[in-house]
């Protein structure tokens, strides 16, 4: 079993750990146990967390010496109404469909936007502001290189906001390494993260990053009220056929190119 690296944590007086309580974060949180007495554990609530995750985080947080639940932007629904749905549909990583969907009448009534904009305002900016307020001397992250295999050293430097006082204890771990650690230490996870699924479940309203049909099925089965709110009450049902129409239009071009290459 691989070991975590916590270089510099002994000297740190105010370490901070942003924890989603997913598998990676939960593994790192377990490894942090010897230093939890001085580590600020921060749960970044994007406003669209699955209810069981939010409850799990706060219940777990009650037993931590230092814990903060940060929800700077409030409910995701307010942002959806004013700024649009976080969506980013790509075709084989060749061109995004967001712009073409935006001009359709049905979709324009509800608006869509890049999911990265949503992430920045609901996760990264609140994290930055809280860090400026708390002034930690060591940043701890559960990020892994496997999550971003094409990122360069410069990319990782940017993600660290230029600070040198940061550590990623499981940076070189694989998914299998993480699950091996979790199983060996019998670490419990919130219901939403227990399925060992490959999609991301940080926000039930996200239609962008790592979207899978299993994630939508899970929402319908476990949280039917939220599913109905997304696809009925809030009008997303109107966007679905628009997305399909644009998707078919885009793929038809590349199918045509493939046929030309075969001639």
Question: Predicted segment positions?
Answer:
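ATP-dependent adenylation/nucleotidyltransferase module used to activate substrates
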Residues: 1-184, 263
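ATP/NTP-dependent adenylation/nucleotidyl-transfer catalytic domains that generate, transfer
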Residues: 11-14, 177-179, 183-263
């Amino acid at each position: 079993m691989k070991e975590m690296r916590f270089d510099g944590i002994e000297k740190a007086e105010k370490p901070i750990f942003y924890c989603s309580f997913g598998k990676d974060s939960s593994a790192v949180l377990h490894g942090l146990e010897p230093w939890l007495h001085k580590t600020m554990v921060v749960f970044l609530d994007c406003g669209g967390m699955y209810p069981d995750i939010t409850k799990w985080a706060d219940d777990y947080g009650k037993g931590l010496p230092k814990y903060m639940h940060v929800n700077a932007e409030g409910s995701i629904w307010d942002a959806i109404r004013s700024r649009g749905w976080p969506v980013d549909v790509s075709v084989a990583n060749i061109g995004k469909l967001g712009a073409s969907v935006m001009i359709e009448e049905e979709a324009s009534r509800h608006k869509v936007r890049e999911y990265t904009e949503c992430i920045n305002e609901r996760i990264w900016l609140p994290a930055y502001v809280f860090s400026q307020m708390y002034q930690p001397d060591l940043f701890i992250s559960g990020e892994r290189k496997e999550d971003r295999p094409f990122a360069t050293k410069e990319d990782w430097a940017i993600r660290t906001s230029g600070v040198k006082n940061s550590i990623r204890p499981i940076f070189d771990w694989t998914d299998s390494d993480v699950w091996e650690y979790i199983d060996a230490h019998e670490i419990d996870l919130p219901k939403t993260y227990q399925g060992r699924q490959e999609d991301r479940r940080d926000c039930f309203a996200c239609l962008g990053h790592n979207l899978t049909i299993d994630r939508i099925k899970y929402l319908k089965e476990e949280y039917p009220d939220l599913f109905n709110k997304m696809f009925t009450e809030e009008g997303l049902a109107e966007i679905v056929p628009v997305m399909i129409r644009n998707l078919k239009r885009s793929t038809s071009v590349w199918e045509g190119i493939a046929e030309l290459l075969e001639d």
